[in-house]
Amino acid sequence: MKEWIVATKNKGKVAEFEAILGKRGFSVKSLLDYPAIEDIEETGSTFNENATIKAEAIAERFQRPVLADDSGLIIDALDGRPGIFSARYAGEEKDDQKNIEKVLRELQDIPWKARTARFHCSIALARPQAETIVFEGTCEGYITTEPKGTGGFGYDPIFYVPSHDKTMAELTQEEKNKLSHRYHALKQLDKWLD
């Protein structure tokens, strides 16, 4: 069994990586397994840059392949915000509830048809002595007027997926794994592994 390090401490992201990579026979370790490693500062201006920064920093330390993801919510009516600042949109404490409240306040006068949004995910694969490769995926939807559902994490309770007539937080983990932005990026990685 091959072991991959996923450069995140986000349990929700780890679960998505495990669900998808586990089917391929990979074992997933995350930065939760290495508590001594400090957070990597995301100094990039794009999802791709931030994912690459994290993957390369951890790969250099461990001298083995590392996957890092940077993802976020892009809302058209907010000119792409929160974007790369999705996790800390309402402040550095990275509070999901406060982030949701801020988005809903900013969209309160925006009609449904203009509440289009997408989750974007960039996954960087960094390997010692090799060029870093980035895989991207998106999931299109709308921002609801109020949170619905208890599953998932982050903005899932306000991200409506038209094809399922539910928010991401109302989907089962299995349903989410088949349509999420991370799933689409991991599918690109999976193709590359073949």
Curated annotation (Swiss-Prot):
Requisite cofactors: Mg(2+)
GO biological process: nucleotide metabolic process; purine nucleoside triphosphate catabolic process
Gene Ontology MF term list: dITP diphosphatase activity; ITP diphosphatase activity; metal ion binding; nucleotide binding; ribonucleoside triphosphate phosphatase activity; XTP diphosphatase activity
Highest rank taxon of the organism: Bacteria
Binding residues for Mg(2+): 41, 70
Pfam families attached to this UniProt entry: Ham1p_like
Cofactor note: Binds 1 Mg(2+) ion per subunit.
Active site: 70
Binding site for substrate: 8-13, 71, 153-156, 176, 181-182
This enzyme's EC code(s): 3.6.1.66
Listed InterPro entries: dITP/XTP_pyrophosphatase, ITPase-like_fam, RdgB/HAM1
Reactions catalysed, as given in the entry: XTP + H2O = XMP + diphosphate + H(+); dITP + H2O = dIMP + diphosphate + H(+); ITP + H2O = IMP + diphosphate + H(+)
GO cellular component term of the entry, any: cytosol
Keywords, comma-separated and alphabetical: Hydrolase, Magnesium, Metal-binding, Nucleotide metabolism, Nucleotide-binding
SUPFAM superfamilies from the UniProt entry: ITPase-like (SSF52972)
Protein family membership: Belongs to the HAM1 NTPase family.
Role played: Pyrophosphatase that catalyzes the hydrolysis of nucleoside triphosphates to their monophosphate derivatives, with a high preference for the non-canonical purine nucleotides XTP (xanthosine triphosphate), dITP (deoxyinosine triphosphate) and ITP. Seems to function as a house-cleaning enzyme that removes non-canonical purine nucleotides from the nucleotide pool, thus preventing their incorporation into DNA/RNA and avoiding chromosomal lesions.
Subunit architecture: Homodimer.
NCBIfam families recorded: PRK14822.1 (NF011397), RdgB/HAM1 family non-canonical purine NTP pyrophosphatase (TIGR00042)
UniProt xrefs under PANTHER family: INOSINE TRIPHOSPHATE PYROPHOSPHATASE, INOSINE TRIPHOSPHATE PYROPHOSPHATASE/HAM1 PROTEIN
Name of this chain's protein: dITP/XTP pyrophosphatase
Organism this protein belongs to: Halalkalibacterium halodurans (strain ATCC BAA-125 / DSM 18197 / FERM 7344 / JCM 9153 / C-125)
